[in-house]
Amino acid sequence: MVYTPSKGPRTLYDKVFDAHVVHQDENGSFLLYIDRHLVHEVTSPQAFEGLENAGRKVRRVDCTLATVDHNIPTESRKNFKSLDTFIKQTDSRLQVKTLENNVKQFGVPYFGMSDARQGIVHTIGPEEGFTLPGTTVVCGDSHTSTHGAFGSLAFGIGTSEVEHVLATQTIIQAKSKNMRITVNGKLSPGITSKDLILYIIGLIGTAGGTGCVIEFAGEAIEALSMEARMSMCNMAIEAGARAGMIKPDETTFQYTKGRPLAPKGAEWEKAVAYWKTLKTDEGAKFDHEINIEAVDVIPTITWGTSPQDALPITGSVPDPKNVTDPIKKSGMERALAYMGLEPNTPLKSIKVDKVFIGSCTNGRIEDLRSAAAVVRGQKLASNIKLAMVVPGSGLVKKQAEAEGLDKIFQEAGFEWREAGCSICLGMNPDILDAYERCASTSNRNFEGRQGALSRTHLMSPAMAAAAGIAGHFVDIREFEYKDQDQSSPKVEVTSEDEKELESAAYDHAEPVQPEDAPQDIANDELKDIPVKSDDTPAKPSSSGMKPFLTLEGISAPLDKANVDTDAIIPKQFLKTIKRTGLKKGLFYEWRFRKDDQGKDQETDFVLNVEPWREAEILVVTGDNFGCGSSREHAPWALKDFGIKSIIAPSYGDIFYNNSFKNGLLPIRLDQQIIIDKLIPIANKGGKLCVDLPNQKILDSDGNVLVDHFEIEPFRKHCLVNGLDDIGITLQKEEYISRYEALRREKYSFLEGGSKLLKFDNVPKRKAVTTTFDKVHQDW
């Protein structure tokens, strides 16, 4: 059916969503066009394999950009010769080489390890100008929300959806709710966007934004730089949101102008005119509104194993004795035991073993400048075993080196590394040893996130750097800086040939001049007459899933909240290029312990005990099951084990979506109903019967326990009929072609994409001249 946007006031999210609707089904699902697709080595192998098996191609290589980041070592590449000799871990090397083969086979633009532009996907997109305001951006990575800082609708997707976007350049979506978080006033000196977003997550919890797109607004947000805004939106996913967005403004335009893939000339002017309309209208309705006073935010760190375990640095480790909710109390006790902390311990007294500055949250040039200002003229504390600085991209690294930041870090005792995800998730050689405590600028502090039994505390770059110097957590506002009058080199590009490569990491000399804001551009209704696409349609496929009708099986209880995807399947099991063989990895850290010989020994975890070894239904009492990363390996592992349905109060949005793509049925039920009616049966190893056509849950005797559970009509239709999403979408080829014709005309400034990149003669960095300028620490 033809989609007609609301005529009333709309939010920023509404406007971007409306502008990308290709088709709306009668059951309420939407087919959205995707402007930008970022691809990396971990979540793409199975997607490309699916394309090859179905005889399909990548529909829009110009809208696609690939790189390697998760698996690669961050040690020096000075003597890099080949992947075979450089990447020592066999499974990591296989994923990287598989991506290289896939991008060659399908013609996808790619920044490999010998390309100076290689880096973390969420760093290279913005710095190259591939990310643009008002676009839809997806990647097989949950922190794709980063790009929402540009006023784009950006969200993580699973591998099945990666394949869907590669094949159709579209994605099937339900409309999310609107949430606005307004930060009134100005942040106090010493407070960063990392402190602010940790404060927000601590306030609303990791499920606070579930089902919503969060718009960050207010004076404090508008005062942030683009890189600080990216840190905010990066962690919107940790608040449970589908995406985070900030309206584009002059700060956005100035950052974007002149980037290699940004529009030029008349197309730039056309783009800015449109981008200026992308703001929430007066009177637009939000489903949820939260107001925060900026003055209330002070330096914030995490103490436990969830980003919501955030406290002001002036606080102390919480005491479970003060918690009445049994699930929350149990979770707090587990977190304290895992983190090796005692209740009521002052946070500033906690000692640190290692420091990590980097990641897609805080690996940009401003982050490195902030940390360098702290460590200048200082030395690492004697108890610090290792402190690493890992730039977010090769261009960030070169910029930092041109400013002399690498020397500042190295003189203080920090290691200066190559670009990559590094110790953020430990899929590469950078990991913590068991029980080591890390001051980290990354985004997740889950159990085992940075290595088996690792202990992670999240904080800002300045706070992490200060912890490295002091040897324990400190309040950055009390930290004594040294040598602030010293000069630091600042680069001057000396060759026109270098500008195409380097401009992404350098300040721009020509800021955008303010212009009169045009009238809001209305979204055109799609014409009824199909327009022939310039692209050959992808082939339909007969592939599909087994229909899901009724399921009667043993039910297993899981009395936990915030069960993240790192817990469902740890990072070491992600190094595969197949969708199967992941049964052993399911809840690995809970199901197994190493014996004295280093062999896996089963624990008494429920799925290791009869009769639950044969469980097909998992009954969870706590909220937010499957929160965290976009790894589709989580439902793959559940499916491999034999679990076909999960029942929980709520889910992480990406996990919930990924489950349906693999024929699993995640059911949302009120927590008390689960506890009162289902858990008694699950605790006994009894069977439950899930009747999807009638949306009921029964016991083994046929007694109705739940007379109705909710499920979106389109998802139910696909499960009951075993339908393949890609096949369904390709039946709408005429609508996709029609939208692409509209896009070429109305949004012509998006048409260049990654095809504008230069690969044949990427210029090598020539010697640069430097001038010296005082370091400016922008609080």
Swiss-Prot record:
<keyword id="KW-0100">Branched-chain amino acid biosynthesis</keyword>
<feature type="binding site">
    <location>
        <position position="360"/>
    </location>
    <ligand>
        <name>[4Fe-4S] cluster</name>
    </ligand>
</feature>
<dbReference type="Pfam" id="PF00330">
    <property type="entry name" value="Aconitase"/>
</dbReference>
<dbReference type="InterPro" id="IPR000573">
    <property type="entry name" value="AconitaseA/IPMdHydase_ssu_swvl"/>
</dbReference>
<protein>
    <recommendedName>
        <fullName>3-isopropylmalate dehydratase</fullName>
        <ecNumber>4.2.1.33</ecNumber>
    </recommendedName>
</protein>
<feature type="compositionally biased region" description="Basic and acidic residues">
    <location>
        <begin position="501"/>
        <end position="510"/>
    </location>
</feature>
<keyword id="KW-0408">Iron</keyword>
<keyword id="KW-0004">4Fe-4S</keyword>
<feature type="binding site">
    <location>
        <position position="424"/>
    </location>
    <ligand>
        <name>[4Fe-4S] cluster</name>
    </ligand>
</feature>
<keyword id="KW-0456">Lyase</keyword>
<dbReference type="GO" id="GO:0046872">
    <property type="term" value="F:metal ion binding"/>
</dbReference>
<dbReference type="Pfam" id="PF00694">
    <property type="entry name" value="Aconitase_C"/>
</dbReference>
<keyword id="KW-0597">Phosphoprotein</keyword>
<dbReference type="InterPro" id="IPR004431">
    <property type="entry name" value="3-IsopropMal_deHydase_ssu"/>
</dbReference>
<keyword id="KW-0028">Amino-acid biosynthesis</keyword>
<dbReference type="InterPro" id="IPR015928">
    <property type="entry name" value="Aconitase/3IPM_dehydase_swvl"/>
</dbReference>
<feature type="modified residue" description="Phosphothreonine">
    <location>
        <position position="494"/>
    </location>
</feature>
<comment type="function">
    <text>Catalyzes the isomerization between 2-isopropylmalate and 3-isopropylmalate, via the formation of 2-isopropylmaleate.</text>
</comment>
<feature type="modified residue" description="Phosphoserine">
    <location>
        <position position="488"/>
    </location>
</feature>
<dbReference type="InterPro" id="IPR012235">
    <property type="entry name" value="3-IsopropMal_deHydtase_ssu/lsu"/>
</dbReference>
<dbReference type="GO" id="GO:0010494">
    <property type="term" value="C:cytoplasmic stress granule"/>
</dbReference>
<dbReference type="InterPro" id="IPR033941">
    <property type="entry name" value="IPMI_cat"/>
</dbReference>
<dbReference type="InterPro" id="IPR001030">
    <property type="entry name" value="Acoase/IPM_deHydtase_lsu_aba"/>
</dbReference>
<dbReference type="InterPro" id="IPR018136">
    <property type="entry name" value="Aconitase_4Fe-4S_BS"/>
</dbReference>
<feature type="binding site">
    <location>
        <position position="421"/>
    </location>
    <ligand>
        <name>[4Fe-4S] cluster</name>
    </ligand>
</feature>
<dbReference type="InterPro" id="IPR036008">
    <property type="entry name" value="Aconitase_4Fe-4S_dom"/>
</dbReference>
<dbReference type="InterPro" id="IPR015931">
    <property type="entry name" value="Acnase/IPM_dHydase_lsu_aba_1/3"/>
</dbReference>
<dbReference type="GO" id="GO:0003861">
    <property type="term" value="F:3-isopropylmalate dehydratase activity"/>
</dbReference>
<comment type="subunit">
    <text>Monomer.</text>
</comment>
<dbReference type="InterPro" id="IPR033940">
    <property type="entry name" value="IPMI_Swivel"/>
</dbReference>
<feature type="region of interest" description="Disordered">
    <location>
        <begin position="484"/>
        <end position="518"/>
    </location>
</feature>
<keyword id="KW-0432">Leucine biosynthesis</keyword>
<dbReference type="InterPro" id="IPR050067">
    <property type="entry name" value="IPM_dehydratase_rel_enz"/>
</dbReference>
<dbReference type="GO" id="GO:0005829">
    <property type="term" value="C:cytosol"/>
</dbReference>
<dbReference type="InterPro" id="IPR004430">
    <property type="entry name" value="3-IsopropMal_deHydase_lsu"/>
</dbReference>
<dbReference type="GO" id="GO:0009316">
    <property type="term" value="C:3-isopropylmalate dehydratase complex"/>
</dbReference>
<keyword id="KW-0411">Iron-sulfur</keyword>
<dbReference type="GO" id="GO:0051539">
    <property type="term" value="F:4 iron, 4 sulfur cluster binding"/>
</dbReference>
<comment type="similarity">
    <text>Belongs to the aconitase/IPM isomerase family.</text>
</comment>
<feature type="modified residue" description="Phosphoserine">
    <location>
        <position position="495"/>
    </location>
</feature>
<keyword id="KW-0479">Metal-binding</keyword>
<comment type="pathway">
    <text>Amino-acid biosynthesis; L-leucine biosynthesis; L-leucine from 3-methyl-2-oxobutanoate: step 2/4.</text>
</comment>
